[in-house]
């Protein structure tokens, strides 16, 4: 196979931290509030601006509360579980590495007596029809390490008594979110917005706030996780008064991303960019003799974390360690040629390729990286078969 001679303009395909919005450079951060307290008037204004712009772009209902929290999406999910659980039985639905992490917390770390853990292997969604609306529920909207997303939220009752916590970190800003079905939604700045790591967002419904004020967990809650003070909802967190000190440089960076999102047409265009990225890969997969989607149901294929695996019988016959090493070499060849970075699948996922297709990735760059994946696979396979 002939080596491609056209490379992506931006070869960054990492699933986090994700590539910056087109046109980004360090000069865009020149107005950052550096050397000033995040609790100063100007500091709080910047933080509140992040909250309000996020609400407007994502079309979050006015009655939902939005807060900036530490430790990225992970911190936001942990905060929700540790503060809200203990009143009702808990169900966790997981099908990728991070969903399995939440299942570990619920099943082994939190002292919960009645927890149901519905786990499936990579590529398959669990059976949501088993859910009980009296229970609290945790799930990821999009399994970032599996490339598998939920089809819809029809399985969530509008008259539920339990709370629904959704880790939506690789879904928001690229997929339409049905807010009324969710009581807690979390995400980070580093995913679809292409901003910096370490900062998370937590969104609470009125029902979640009611739980905070009516239930005190039986376990200690560290300061960094506390969403309530003496059974009173801590509103300050949701008006720019963060629990601990955020990076004001990162705040300026995420404001740039949010302004960029507004400038291109808001949530509708963000979703369209990601959808087009997936359609480009789908068309390529249809003609591929080597690759297929990891997702087994076409309706569940993610448009952000696009995971593909070799279907080549030669590859399937390799030992597991050999498969892992082979795909590392494939991705290494692409990187050596500066045609695509960070394309290797997640360490616990089946060996393959993961292309980030979020809204900061331009469609033409996805088109340009695909021939390099074909070439690198064949190049490395020839080395293996000739040894």
What are these model-predicted stretches?
Residues 190-284:
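Active-site C-terminal subdomain of aminotransferase-like
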Residues 27-79, 83, 97-105, 286:
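Conserved N-terminal alpha-helix of the aminotransferase class I/II PLP-enzyme fold
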Residues 1-41:
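N-terminal "arm"/small-domain region of PLP-dependent enzymes with the aminotransferase-like
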Residues 179-190, 200:
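Conserved active-site segment immediately N-terminal to the catalytic lysine
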Residues 75, 82-137:
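PLP-dependent aminotransferase-like
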Residues 121-173, 184, 192:
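Active-site phosphate-binding strand-loop segment of PLP-dependent enzymes
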Residues 286, 290-364, 368:
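Conserved C-terminal alpha-helix-loop-beta "cap" of PLP-dependent enzymes
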């Amino acid at each position: 196979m002939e080596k491609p001679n056209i490379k992506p303009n931006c070869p960054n395909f990492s699933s986090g931290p994700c590539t910056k919005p087109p046109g980004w450079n360090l000069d865009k951060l020149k107005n950052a509030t550096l050397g000033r307290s995040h609790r100063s008037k100007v500091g709080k204004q910047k933080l509140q601006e992040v909250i309000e712009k996020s609400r407007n772009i994502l079309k979050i209902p006015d009655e939902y509360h939005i807060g900036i929290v530490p430790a990225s999406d992970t911190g936001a999910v942990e905060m929700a579980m540790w503060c809200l659980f203990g009143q009702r039985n808990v169900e966790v639905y997981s099908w990728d590495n991070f969903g399995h992490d939440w299942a570990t917390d619920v099943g082994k770390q939190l002292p919960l007596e009645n927890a149901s853990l519905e786990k499936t292997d990579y590529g398959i969604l669990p059976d949501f029809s088993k859910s009980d609306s009296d229970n609290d529920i945790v799930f990821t909207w999009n399994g970032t390490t599996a490339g598998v997303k939920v089809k819809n939220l029809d399985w969530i009752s509008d008259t539920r008594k339990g709370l629904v916590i959704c880790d939506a970190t690789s879904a928001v800003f690229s997929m339409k979110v049905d807010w009324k079905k969710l009581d807690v939604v979390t995400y980070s700045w580093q995913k679809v917005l292409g901003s910096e790591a370490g900062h998370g967002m937590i969104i609470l419904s009125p029902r979640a706030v009611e739980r905070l004020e009516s239930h005190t967990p039986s376990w200690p809650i560290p300061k960094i996780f506390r969403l309530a003070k003496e059974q009173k909802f801590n509103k300050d967190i949701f008006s720019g008064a963060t629990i601990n000190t955020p990076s004001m440089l990162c705040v300026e960076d995420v404001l740039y991303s949010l302004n960029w999102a507004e400038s291109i047409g808001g949530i509708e265009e963000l979703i369209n960019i990601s959808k087009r990225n997936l359609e480009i890969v789908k068309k390529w997969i249809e003609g591929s003799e080597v690759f297929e989607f990891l997702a087994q149901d076409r309706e569940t294929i993610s448009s952000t974390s696009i995971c593909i695996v070799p279907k080549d019988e030669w590859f399937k016959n390799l030992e597991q360690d050999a498969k892992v090493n082979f795909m590392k070499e494939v991705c290494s060849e692409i990187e050596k040629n500066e045609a695509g970075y960070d394309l290797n699948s997640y360490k616990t996922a089946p060996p393959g390729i993961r292309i980030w297709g979020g809204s900061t990735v331009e469609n033409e760059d996805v088109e340009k990286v695909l021939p390099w994946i074909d070439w690198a696979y064949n190049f490395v396979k020839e080395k293996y078969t000739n040894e």
